[in-house]
């Protein structure tokens, strides 16, 4: 048997074992739901304060958690830019949202063409936003990735820079309340153990061993590395904003086991049908994002919340050891910024 065939056989065996291993946590999840349910605690969207006059951007706002994040922000008076790549899907989502919620003014939900895989197009969106608005109060980096794709940039980097540049007075206004929310997941704990974000290659191909790229393990590792990057990015953003005395609060979060296409795609094929029955609905999954973006207690006690990782509305959790690696966070920021600056994108903001 040739070495190539031996390698392929080993990959298939390990991948099958990995896929089978996922049944155990799903079984535990089922038992937990049977006994305790999937409640998110005492906080829900009814506690969102009035947001009249505020401007928000929600990436990936046309479906899943993002859709319900847009819905509840707009219903409380915010003007929400629904960031999405597909015009037809975005407008269909807006049409559905307005039909289901006739009290939301039509002008409160606006499509923002936003393809996070295209840096130039993301900057176009940021420039468009700056031309239309004098402020940006809330950015929810919610858009996920397809686990079959490689990571190209830290999710939402350019839009996060737009928050900073669209709010030049944020550092001087003590009463301002600007928040950047980055949606991660508990999958951040299952990233590649060797990835330290020391080179652009660590973003492009987190599963460096040849042959594993499209395996179940490779897809899960790619997903986990993306989610790890989300947490590191949010923490590093907060550190930098604090250094500049900018009144910007950065949070990352785990929305929970939510019934979305992204969650299903990470699972082995034979497990995916169980997602529908075991995972919670996207509307409930949006609660943590909404708490992070709007809860008044975060503004009132900002030092307690700055840079934190939430595991439910109002629940601060210590993320994995790797997600607390400040050096990796700085490395991630630096290689991402270098990659974006190399395109000339930031010069346009």
From Swiss-Prot:
Pfam families in the cross-refs: adh_short
Q: Which residues bind NADP(+)?
A: 65, 89, 115, 142, 164, 223, 227
Q: What industrial or biotechnological use does the UniProt record describe for it?
A: Diterpenoid pyrones display various biological activities and FDDP E shows anti-HIV activity. FDDP D and FDDP E show also inhibitory activity of 42-mer-amyloid beta aggregation that is involved in the pathogenesis of Alzheimer's disease.
Q: Which residues form the active site?
A: 191-192, 223, 227
How this chain sits in the membrane, per its record, is:
Single-pass membrane protein
Compartments it resides in:
Membrane
Q: Name one GO biological process term.
A: terpenoid biosynthetic process
Under the heading InterPro entries, the entry gives:
NAD(P)-bd_dom_sf (IPR036291), SDR_fam (IPR002347)
Its keywords, alphabetically, are:
Glycoprotein, Membrane, NADP, Oxidoreductase, Transmembrane, Transmembrane helix
* Predominant subcellular localization, coarse grouping: membrane
Q: What top-tier enzyme class does this entry carry?
A: oxidoreductase
What this protein is reported to do is described as:
Short chain dehydrogenase/reductase; part of the gene cluster that mediates the biosynthesis of diterpenoid pyrones. The first step of the pathway is the synthesis of the alpha-pyrone moiety by the polyketide synthase dpfgA via condensation of one acetyl-CoA starter unit with 3 malonyl-CoA units and 2 methylations. The alpha-pyrone is then combined with geranylgeranyl pyrophosphate (GGPP) formed by the GGPP synthase dpfgD through the action of the prenyltransferase dpfgC to yield a linear alpha-pyrone diterpenoid.
Q: What is this protein called?
A: Short chain dehydrogenase/reductase dpfgH
């Amino acid at each position: 048997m040739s070495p190539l065939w031996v390698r392929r056989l080993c990959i298939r065996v390990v991948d099958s074992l990995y896929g089978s291993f996922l049944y155990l946590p799903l079984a535990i999840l089922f038992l937990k739901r049977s006994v305790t349910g999937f409640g998110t605690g005492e906080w829900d969207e009814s506690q969102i304060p009035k947001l009249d006059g505020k401007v928000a951007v929600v990436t990936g706002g046309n479906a899943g958690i993002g859709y319900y994040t847009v819905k509840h922000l707009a219903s409380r008076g915010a003007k929400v830019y629904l960031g999405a790549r597909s015009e037809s899907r975005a407008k269909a989502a807006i049409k559905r949202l307005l039909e289901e919620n006739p009290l939301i003014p039509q002008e409160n939900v606006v499509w923002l063409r936003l393809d996070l895989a295209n840096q130039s197009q993301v900057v176009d969106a940021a420039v468009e936003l700056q031309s239309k608005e004098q402020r940006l109060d809330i950015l929810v980096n919610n858009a996920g990735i397809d686990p079959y794709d490689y990571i190209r940039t830290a999710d939402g980097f350019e839009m996060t820079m737009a928050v900073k540049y669209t709010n030049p007075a944020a550092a001087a206004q003590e009463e301002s309340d600007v928040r950047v929310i980055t949606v991660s997941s508990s999958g951040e704990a299952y990233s590649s153990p060797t990835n330290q974000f020391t080179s652009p290659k660590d973003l492009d191909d987190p599963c460096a061993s040849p042959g594993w790229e499209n395996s179940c393990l490779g897809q899960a590792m790619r997903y986990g590395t993306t989610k790890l990057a989300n947490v590191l990015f949010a923490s590093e953003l907060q550190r930098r904003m604090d250094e500049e005395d900018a009144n910007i609060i950065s949070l990352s979060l785990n929305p929970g086991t939510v019934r979305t296409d992204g969650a299903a795609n990470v699972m082995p094929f034979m497990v995916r049908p169980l997602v529908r029955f075991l995972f919670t609905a996207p509307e409930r999954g949006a609660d943590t994002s909404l708490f992070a973006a709007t809860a008044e207690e975060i503004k009132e006690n900002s030092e307690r919340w700055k840079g934190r990782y939430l595991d439910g509305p109002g629940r601060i959790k210590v993320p994995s050891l790797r997600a607390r690696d400040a050096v990796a966070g700085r490395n991630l920021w630096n290689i991402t910024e270098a990659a974006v600056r190399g395109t000339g994108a930031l010069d346009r903001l």
